């Protein structure tokens, strides 16, 4: 069972700043990004949601550190430490939509950023204990976590509200977020190594379509654990119709709150998969 943060009010999502995070540039696959590192223990790559490493992402990062992980957060977009809702956030999202590394509108896409993230995962695995690393993707980056698991170093992919490709058509909404060639590697790892993943979404979230989860569930079967939180009108916990960020903005550290319980499950999953032999 994971502990509550005593500094967070029950009615607020956990947040943090960059205190204690060490920045270092990492270059791979033709890209260079600053990467923020903190903690000791098995490694977890935490890929930020749009519009970047905001205080909610850092709150999640600190929670993982407190639970015994080494966490690295690549700054793929935005201004690290800046608020999620701020002037300039829309411009960050627009740039993301046209950046070739993200291929935001492409189906069956082998995204260039996935190659960078695999290299980052391998590097983290070499520097941390345990049999491999976890990768958490959120929102824009949600599907990147599964694409990263093409590399054998990734043992615990977590897809939180995966939003790419942007759901313009039924084909886009049903797309798994990675190429067929990449998905075949995941299939093989599931069959031969017992790889498994967790996917999280709110039931009414149009940005993380249910059709995408259906595609992944049909393909991966029991290896894809789905956590879907009820956000229908009148739901018991008062989630709004646009509830989206399962592990950050919607978490309230109260037992029984679904996003809080989902975060507990993610930590449990990481510990199960990454425990040193």
List each language-model region with its residue ranges.
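N-terminal cap/leader regions of alpha/beta-hydrolase-fold enzymes
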Residues: 1-277
């Amino acid at each position: 069972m994971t502990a509550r943060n005593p500094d967070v009010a029950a009615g607020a999502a956990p947040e943090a700043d960059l205190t204690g995070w060490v920045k270092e540039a990492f270059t791979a696959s033709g890209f260079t990004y600053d990467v923020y590192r903190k903690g000791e223990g098995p490694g977890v790559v935490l890929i930020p949601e749009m519009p970047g490493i905001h205080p909610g992402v850092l709150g999640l990062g600190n929670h993982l550190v407190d639970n015994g992980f080494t966490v690295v957060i690549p700054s793929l977009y935005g201004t690290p430490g800046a608020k999620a809702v701020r002037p300039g956030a829309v411009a960050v999202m627009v740039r993301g939509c046209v950046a070739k590394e993200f291929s935001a509108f492409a189906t069956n896409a082998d995204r260039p950023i996935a190659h960078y993230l695999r290299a980052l995962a391998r590097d983290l695995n070499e520097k941390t204990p345990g049999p491999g690393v976890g990768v958490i993707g959120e929102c824009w980056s949600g599907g990147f976590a599964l694409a990263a698991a093409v590399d054998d170093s990734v043992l615990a992919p977590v897809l939180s509200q995966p939003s790419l490709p942007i759901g313009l058509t039924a084909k886009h909404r049903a797309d798994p977020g990675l190429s067929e060639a990449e998905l075949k590697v995941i299939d093989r790892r599931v069959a031969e190594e017992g790889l498994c993943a967790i996917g999280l979404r709110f039931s009414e979230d149009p940005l993380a379509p249910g059709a995408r989860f259906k595609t992944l569930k049909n393909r991966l079967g029991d290896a894809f654990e789905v956590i879907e939180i009820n956000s229908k009108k009148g739901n018991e916990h008062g989630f709004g119709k646009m509830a989206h960020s399962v592990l950050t903005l919607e978490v309230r550290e109260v037992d029984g709150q679904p996003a809080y319980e989902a975060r507990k499950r993610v930590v449990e999953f990481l510990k199960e998969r990454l425990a040193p032999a």
